[in-house]
Design a protein with these regions (language model features):
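Active-site helix of classical SDR
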Residues: 122, 159, 167
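Substrate-binding pocket helix/loop in short-chain dehydrogenase/reductase
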Residues: 98-99, 106-111, 208
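Short C-terminal tail/terminal secondary-structure segment
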Residues: 228, 239-260
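Residue(s) in the substrate-gating loop at a strand-loop-helix junction
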Residues: 143
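Active-site loop-to-helix junction immediately N-terminal to the catalytic Tyr of the SDR YXXXK motif
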Residues: 102, 149-157, 169, 197, ...
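Alpha-helical segment proximal to the catalytic Tyr-Lys
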Residues: 127, 172-176, 236
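Conserved glycine-rich cofactor-binding loop
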Residues: 17-18
């Protein structure tokens, strides 16, 4: 676990109950933050899981940010969370398949979840921070595929590249208020489908191993530690930056054997 000293008292995390999110909220709780977890699970189930990782000094909010399109509804969510002074934007989805096989709905869902909803949430958070002179920080979770394309996830890669560009714009526009925005770009993390394929599909494991110079999947804790660093006093001079922690996966393009 990270031993950073955090610069923020209250941190909201979207996508908080996913494989990476659970390690993030646990780590931030252990570092003394009041943690606000936002996710899709209903309140009863979400609270049960949340308490396993944050037994006290935190709260769970059930919300689908892709459906909270109005300014009023987003402000209501933020009011429930007592307006955090830092937000970790972890919510995201991937739809796998070549672009020609993806429907309009697939593409729209990826862009809505990974990019559009993050923009709208950021807008409402920053309005509050400016009005209350809060020197907050937005942290966006992008991906190494922002830098090196991975076959079969073009809309996902575009959404993550867009999130990176958006973060830089937010950083530039709001630095005068003491508001910062940074990005963390993990590699192939040992959760979800990647973890399943790594363990069960020899071809995928061989292909992924060739793509990762360090030769292993990234642990969720390694992502959480990177986020803790960005929230720490050691990173207070960083804004508009991208913390790329990918085991070297972005160092070189794929060879032909790595194409699906």
């Amino acid at each position: 676990m990270s031993n950073e000293t955090l610069s923020f008292n209250t941190v909201a995390v979207t996508g908080a109950l996913g494989g990476i999110g659970k390690e993030v909220i646990r780590t931030l709780h252990q570092l003394g933050a009041h943690v606000i977890a936002i996710d899709l699970l209903d309140s009863q189930e979400g609270n049960r899981i949340f308490k396993e990782f944050v037994p006290n000094n935190g709260e769970y909010i059930c919300s689908d940010l892709t459906q909270e399109s109005s300014e009023a509804s987003l402000q209501a969510i933020l009011a429930k969370s007592n307006y955090p002074d830092a937000v970790v934007s972890l919510a995201g989805i991937v739809v796998s398949g070549n672009l020609v096989d993806q429907s309009n709905s697939d593409i729209d869902r990826v862009l809505s979840t990974n990019l559009n909803s993050q923009m709208k949430l950021t807008r409402e958070v920053i309005k509050h921070w400016i009005a209350n002179k809060t020197k907050g920080q937005m942290i966006y979770v992008s991906s190494w595929v922002d830098h090196v394309p991975w076959p079969g996830i073009s809309p996902y890669a575009a959404s993550k590249a867009g999130l990176h560009a958006f973060a830089r714009g937010v950083a530039r526009e709001n630095a005068r208020y003491g508001i910062r925005a940074n990005v963390i770009s993990p590699g192939i993390v040992d959760v979800g489908m990647a973890a399943k394929q790594w363990r069960e599909e020899p071809d995928y494991r061989a292909r992924a191993s060739r793509a990762i110079p360090l030769g292993r999947l990234q642990t969720p804790q390694e992502v959480a530690d990177g986020i803790a660093f960005l929230l720490s006093k050691n990173a207070e001079y960083m804004t508009g930056s991208n913390l790329l922690i990918d085991g070297g996966a972005s160092l070189y393009p794929m060879d032909p054997e790595e194409v699906l």
